[in-house]
């Protein structure tokens, strides 16, 4: 016969396990944190240029459109000058409503010019679905940069925006820098892309992919972060004299997060 003490211990362990899973699944994945950083990019005294950066939306049965819409609404409230999307827009684990997804994304381009790159979840599932992602972004007014560059011009400033292909697909092949010698911002899904671009001129790289580790285990860290260089799992970090910013992302795999809230990022470039 089980003792009262062991029964209470087993009951407490069951409750703790259930509560922990409930928190990871029902609480933290929808608890967005608005992150702000001011970065010396132009190195002038003009007003800050505001960029909204979102990545890893991961529309799926685990990440509903309502959650993605909430993240977008929070970002738009900050009145950005430019919006950048860092890849991994879906998980192809179910039939997805791409028309509804386009409707959710449309407010971004209505707010500010919006550019995107692709991530590893956007490319390995066949040409038809890759085509659907590209068409969905396009129908929402979003421009995809696939190893392409464009010049972003404001009344007082210019900089070159580069979007790369996915590193894991062997498609990270950025174009040469322009001859104008402008500040260069790179949009690359995976922060390990820095190694491919080590000898290329750039000043700031914006990445996703890691989800910040998604499950941050006390005393262990981020054992599940899918990158070679763990220094760039999350946040703003130096790479020599350059900087890499890795967002924790909006969505998640399997709808779980622990000590790693989803993120809406506002960057002010000065």
From Swiss-Prot:
Pfam families assigned: Metallophos
Obligatory cofactor(s): a divalent metal cation
A single GO BP: lipid A biosynthetic process
Organism: Escherichia coli (strain K12)
Disulphide linkage map: none
Keyword Transcription regulation: no
Binding residues for a divalent metal cation 2: 88, 120, 209
GO cellular component, one term: membrane
Name of the coding gene: yaeI
Coiled coil region boundaries: none
EC number in record: 3.1.4.-
Positions of a divalent metal cation 1 binding: 56, 58, 88, 211
Stated family: Belongs to the metallophosphoesterase superfamily.
UniProt function note: Shows phosphodiesterase activity, hydrolyzing phosphodiester bond in the artificial chromogenic substrate bis-p-nitrophenyl phosphate (bis-pNPP).
Keywords, comma-separated and alphabetical: Hydrolase, Metal-binding
Cofactor: how and how many bound: Binds 2 divalent metal cations.
Listed GO MF terms: metal ion binding; phosphoric diester hydrolase activity; UDP-2,3-diacylglucosamine hydrolase activity
Protein name: Phosphodiesterase YaeI
């Amino acid at each position: 016969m089980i003792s009262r003490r062991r029964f209470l211990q087993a009951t407490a362990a069951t409750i703790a396990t259930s509560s922990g899973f409930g928190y990871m699944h029902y609480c933290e994945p929808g608890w967005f944190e608005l992150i702000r950083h001011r970065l010396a990019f132009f190195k002038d005294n003009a007003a800050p240029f505001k960029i909204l950066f979102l990545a890893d939306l991961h529309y799926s049965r685990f990440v509903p459109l309502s959650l993605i819409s909430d993240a977008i609404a929070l970002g738009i409230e900050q009145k950005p000058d430019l919006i950048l999307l860092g890849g991994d827009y879906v998980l192809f684990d179910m039939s997805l409503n791409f028309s509804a997804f386009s409707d959710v994304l449309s407010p971004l381009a209505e707010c500010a010019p919006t550019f995107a790159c692709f991530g590893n979840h956007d490319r390995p599932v066949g040409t038809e679905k890759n085509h659907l992602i590209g068409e969905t972004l396009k129908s929402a007014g979003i421009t995809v940069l696939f190893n392409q560059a464009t010049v972003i011009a404001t009344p007082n400033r210019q900089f070159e925006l580069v979007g790369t292909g996915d590193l894991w697909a062997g498609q990270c092949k950025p174009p040469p820098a322009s001859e104008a010698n402008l500040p260069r911002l790179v949009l690359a899904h995976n922060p390990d892309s820095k190694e491919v671009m080590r000898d290329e001129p750039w000043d700031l790289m914006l990445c996703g992919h890691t989800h910040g580790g998604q499950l941050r285990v006390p005393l262990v860290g981020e054992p599940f972060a899918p990158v070679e260089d763990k220094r760039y799992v999350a946040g703003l970090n130096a790479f020599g004299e350059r900087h890499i910013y890795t967002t924790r992302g909006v969505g998640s795999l399997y709808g779980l997060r622990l000590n790693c809230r989803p993120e809406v990022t506002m960057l002010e470039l000065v």
